[in-house]
C-alpha cells in the first residue's frame, strides 16, 4: 500500500504558526534536493528549477543533491549536469543506495572534493542505451550515430571528472561496471565515503 509523499510541520520564519508541507519542500528550504527516481524530463526540469532558485537566493551556500537513481534519459540528465556546472553554488552530491548510469554521472558531476557516498552505496557506469523498434534503416542509422556521439561525450566527461584515462573509461563502460563506495572513491567518481552528515 503506497504511503504517498510524507508531510512534515514547518514554521515560516517570523511566524508562530506551523503548517504541514511535503517533505521535499521542507528539505528544499534547507537547500537539500533529492533525485530518487529514474531521470526524465519532468524530474530534470524540477531539479534544474530548484537549483537555479537556490543559487539565486544565496550562491555562497552549497546545494546538497542526494542521489538514489537507476539512471534514465541522457538528455534530461545532461540538463541537470549543465546546471550543476552553471550555478555559482557548490553542489555537494551524495549517493544513498544506488547511483547507476546517469545517476552515477551526476554523482561525479558534483563540486570536486564534495562528491560523497554512504558506505553501502553502489555506483554503476555504462555506455548509453538506445532502442530500435520497427523503424526504417536510415532512422536507425541516425539514432546509432547520435548514441555514439553521446557515448564519446559522456566518456570524455567521466574521464575529466574521475581522472581516469578516456581509454579506461571507454573499456569500463562497455558493459555495466559496478563499484562499491570505496571502489568508486579509488576510481575518482567520488571524493569520500561518509557515515555522518557533518562529513559531507
UniProtKB/Swiss-Prot annotation:
Which Gene Ontology cellular component terms are annotated? Answer: cytoplasm; endopeptidase Clp complex
For this UniProt record, give its keywords in alphabetical order, as a comma-separated list: Cytoplasm, Hydrolase, Protease, Serine protease
User: From the UniProt record, which GO molecular function terms apply?
Assistant: ATP-dependent peptidase activity; ATPase binding; serine-type endopeptidase activity
Active site positions: 101, 126
Instruction: Identify the InterPro entries for this entry.
Output: ClpP, ClpP/crotonase-like_dom_sf, ClpP/TepA, ClpP_His_AS, ClpP_Ser_AS
- The EC designation for this entry is 3.4.21.92
Question: What reaction(s) does this enzyme catalyze?
Answer: Hydrolysis of proteins to small peptides in the presence of ATP and magnesium. alpha-casein is the usual test substrate. In the absence of ATP, only oligopeptides shorter than five residues are hydrolyzed (such as succinyl-Leu-Tyr-|-NHMec, and Leu-Tyr-Leu-|-Tyr-Trp, in which cleavage of the -Tyr-|-Leu- and -Tyr-|-Trp bonds also occurs)
- Localization per Swiss-Prot or TrEMBL: Cytoplasm
SUPFAM superfamilies in the record: ClpP/crotonase
For biological process, the GO terms are:
protein quality control for misfolded or incompletely synthesized proteins
Could you say which enzyme class this protein belongs to? hydrolase
**Which Pfam families did the record assign?**
CLP_protease
Top-level division of the source organism's lineage: Bacteria
The answer to keyword Oxidoreductase applying to this record is: no
Q: Which family does it belong to?
A: Belongs to the peptidase S14 family.
Q: What does this protein do?
A: Cleaves peptides in various proteins in a process that requires ATP hydrolysis. Has a chymotrypsin-like activity. Plays a major role in the degradation of misfolded proteins.
Q: How does it assemble?
A: Fourteen ClpP subunits assemble into 2 heptameric rings which stack back to back to give a disk-like structure with a central cavity, resembling the structure of eukaryotic proteasomes.
User: What is the designated name of this protein?
Assistant: ATP-dependent Clp protease proteolytic subunit 3
Amino acid at each position: 500500500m503506497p504511503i504517498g509523499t510524507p508531510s512534515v510541520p514547518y514554521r515560516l520564519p517570523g511566524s508562530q504558526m506551523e503548517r504541514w508541507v511535503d517533505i521535499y519542500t521542507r528539505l528544499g528550504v534547507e537547500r537539500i534536493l533529492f533525485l530518487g527516481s529514474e531521470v526524465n524530463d519532468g524530474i530534470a526540469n524540477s531539479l534544474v528549477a530548484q537549483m537555479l532558485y537556490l543559487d539565486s537566493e544565496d550562491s555562497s551556500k552549497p546545494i546538497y543533491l542526494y542521489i538514489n537513481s537507476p539512471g534514465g534519459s541522457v538528455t534530461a540528465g545532461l540538463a541537470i549536469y549543465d546546471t550543476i556546472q552553471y550555478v555559482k553554488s557548490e553542489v555537494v552530491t551524495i549517493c544513498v543506495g544506488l547511483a547507476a548510469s546517469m545517476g552515477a554521472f551526476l554523482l561525479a558531476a558534483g563540486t570536486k572534493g564534495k562528491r560523497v557516498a554512504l558506505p553501502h552505496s553502489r555506483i554503476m557506469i555504462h555506455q548509453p542505451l538506445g532502442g530500435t523498434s520497427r523503424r526504417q534503416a536510415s532512422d536507425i542509422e541516425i539514432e546509432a550515430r547520435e548514441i555514439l556521439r553521446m557515448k564519446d561525450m559522456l566518456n570524455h566527461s567521466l574521464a575529466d571528472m574521475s581522472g581516469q584515462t578516456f581509454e579506461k573509461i571507454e573499456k569500463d563502460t562497455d558493459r555495466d561496471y559496478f563499484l562499491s563506495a570505496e571502489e568508486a572513491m579509488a576510481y575518482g567518481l567520488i571524493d569520500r565515503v561518509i557515515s555522518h552528515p557533518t562529513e559531507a
